[in-house]
């Protein structure tokens, strides 16, 4: 049996029997593929191509819209930054003006307080001076009254007392 198999495969041969080699079946299949496959695959490929082109067009449109929105956002950002810088500079100017106004008011208030203190001091000094003059005059009168009764007569004493009282009323 081994020898019959060995001799059957001895050499290369071509089988020209069309029915045994399935050449007709292959020709029918190839012809069917050639005739019907381009329409079927062509339709599928065309639909796929159209879908891809539509997706690309949609992506390009979205990219354009995104670029437009980005440019608009950049412009708005630049505008907002300019406004923020203007607000910052206005705030600095306002803060400086408030600081200067506050310093001016503080200096004026200090001058007013100093002036008030000086006026109070002058008034107190004047009052003390007046009081000291009165006390000195009173003491002088008392001393004079004690020493004068021996030196002056009654008429001179009355005259002197009247003048002293008049002088005290003037102060």
UniProtKB/Swiss-Prot annotation:
Annotated membrane-spanning segments are: 12-34
This protein's record includes keyword Membrane = yes
Gene Ontology MF, one? proton-transporting ATP synthase activity, rotational mechanism
Q: Where in the cell is it found?
A: Cellular thylakoid membrane
Keywords from the UniProt entry: ATP synthesis, CF(0), Hydrogen ion transport, Ion transport, Membrane, Thylakoid, Transmembrane, Transmembrane helix, Transport
Q: Write down the Pfam families for this protein, in alphabetical order.
A: ATP-synt_B
The UniProt entry, under InterPro entries, shows: ATP_synth_B-like_membr_sf (IPR028987), ATP_synth_b/b'su_bac/chlpt (IPR002146)
| Membrane topology of the entry | Single-pass membrane protein
Extract one GO cellular component term from the record: plasma membrane-derived thylakoid membrane
Which HAMAP family does the UniProt record give? ATP_synth_b_bprime
Q: Subunit notes for this chain? A: F-type ATPases have 2 components, F(1) - the catalytic core - and F(0) - the membrane proton channel. F(1) has five subunits: alpha(3), beta(3), gamma(1), delta(1), epsilon(1). F(0) has four main subunits: a(1), b(1), b'(1) and c(10-14). The alpha and beta chains form an alternating ring which encloses part of the gamma chain. F(1) is attached to F(0) by a central stalk formed by the gamma and epsilon chains, while a peripheral stalk is formed by the delta, b and b' chains.
Q: Which family does it belong to?
A: Belongs to the ATPase B chain family.
Q: What does this protein do?
A: F(1)F(0) ATP synthase produces ATP from ADP in the presence of a proton or sodium gradient. F-type ATPases consist of two structural domains, F(1) containing the extramembraneous catalytic core and F(0) containing the membrane proton channel, linked together by a central stalk and a peripheral stalk. During catalysis, ATP synthesis in the catalytic domain of F(1) is coupled via a rotary mechanism of the central stalk subunits to proton translocation. Component of the F(0) channel, it forms part of the peripheral stalk, linking F(1) to F(0).
Name of this chain's protein: ATP synthase subunit b
């Amino acid at each position: 049996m081994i020898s019959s198999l060995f001799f059957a495969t001895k050499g290369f041969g071509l089988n020209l029997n069309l029915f045994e080699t399935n050449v007709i079946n292959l020709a029918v299949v190839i012809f069917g593929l050639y005739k019907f496959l381009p329409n079927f695959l062509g339709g599928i490929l065309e639909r796929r191509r159209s879908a891809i082109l539509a997706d690309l067009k949609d992506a390009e449109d979205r990219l354009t819209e995104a670029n437009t929105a980005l440019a608009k956002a950049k412009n708005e950002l630049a505008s907002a930054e300019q406004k923020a810088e203007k607000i910052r500079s206005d705030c600095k100017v306002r803060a400086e003006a408030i600081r200067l106004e506050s310093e001016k008011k503080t200096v004026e208030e200090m001058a007013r307080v100093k002036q008030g203190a000086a006026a109070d001091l002058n008034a107190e000094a004047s009052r003390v001076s007046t009081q000291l003059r009165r006390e000195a005059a009173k003491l002088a009168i008392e001393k004079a009254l004690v020493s004068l009764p021996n030196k002056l007569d009654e008429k001179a004493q009355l005259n002197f007392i009247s003048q002293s009282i008049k002088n005290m009323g003037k102060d």
